[in-house]
Amino acid sequence: MHVKKGDKVQVITGKDKGKQGVILVAFPKENRVIVEGVNIVKKHSKPSQLNPQGGIITKEAPIHVSNVMPLDPKTGEPTRVGYKVEDGKKVRIAKKSGELLDK
């Protein structure tokens, strides 16, 4: 996957197009990510021990990884991801500026 947990990304398609957020959870096997404040859904929950009131809960749902692009650390614009080897390690770089995406 071209994005990781903690990356700042922008949604490029769908109902939340243009929104930006940080990746909270990544699911590599399903090619999906949960982005903070994006793809909010309402879930109806029955009363339980943890939530005795029950009711409607809003939370983020997973979004397909192809619908997000990482933001360039230099310009703050969405960018494609490239890879190169530095000191024997494969690192991600922003195609627009050439900046490192990995810390």
Curated annotation (Swiss-Prot):
Single GO molecular function: rRNA binding
Keywords associated with the record: Ribonucleoprotein, Ribosomal protein, RNA-binding, rRNA-binding
CDD domains the UniProt entry points to: KOW_RPL26
Gene3D superfamilies the UniProt entry points to: 2.30.30.30
Classification via InterPro entries: KOW, Rib_uL2_dom2, Ribosomal_uL24, Ribosomal_uL24_CS, Ribosomal_uL24_KOW, Translation_prot_SH3-like_sf
Pfam family of the protein (one): ribosomal_L24
One GO location term (cellular component): ribonucleoprotein complex
A GO biological-process term: translation
Recorded family membership: Belongs to the universal ribosomal protein uL24 family.
Subunit and partners: Part of the 50S ribosomal subunit.
Name of the molecule in the record: Large ribosomal subunit protein uL24
Organism: Bacillus cytotoxicus (strain DSM 22905 / CIP 110041 / 391-98 / NVH 391-98)
